[in-house]
């Protein structure tokens, strides 16, 4: 990977990325200086190439090469066509990007029309987001945010920019996995008043407002669960529920009870979906949660049969093992119950005999 960059006030600003791949992992430093800014239209195919060429000719831009030693090496930018330069990583060519920890600013329309971009990793230091940053980026599905001890970030601003359903992984000072449902806004004309009224659909906006002072509020997120149950499809609610239970960062007892109650109510469907998606992590969690249920054996048998039909050997193996353990536990419970009942009957008979003797 090669980067066109410039140095401003002892900090590196990335102007363009060149690579044969589809994923960009930007360096923390260039020439020993922290990378703090991504220029406008940096990953967009709509950048005015004339301006870029002019900066090249004037010597304002240099080239960073990831193949160099250490943090890469700085080179003079090849002005005449750049025969050794990979194609610009822009537009539909970009699928994932990892931003450096010191990055504070992203210029306007930096990812404009990157329609295949699915994954973005960034840090809490990022505070300045340009206009139209994710315009045309409708494929984004996953965000990873690395937080420092303060916990503040620009996550809400990014969530508002991307209305589609998103999975967010929090790392650093907190570790959590969160699912934010989609939302969309509709303009409805109020003719008598001569105004347009904005109607918001979906519970996604409720969840995107679970922030206070740029910090995520887990309690507010969990309090919105009734919105999701009423407005979202089963798959989305299942993803949200499993994410909170499997990564229970700051999950209060009442929140856990609400999620577990919903999961037990839809246990069969939840197991079925986990088998269909070959999700071993979810399958193991569900099997453990439902192990104490009276209908656990029937649920595990159904899930195992489905795993067989879908040619999911790892799932079949785990489910059969869980079923074996459950049956063994049931046999032990029945044996203990029988022993307890037998002892009670013996005690009762002994007591009656003793009473007759005393009389």
Predicted features and spans:
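A cross-kingdom feature that marks long, compositionally biased intrinsically disordered regions
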Residues: 250-252, 256-271, 275, 304-309, ...
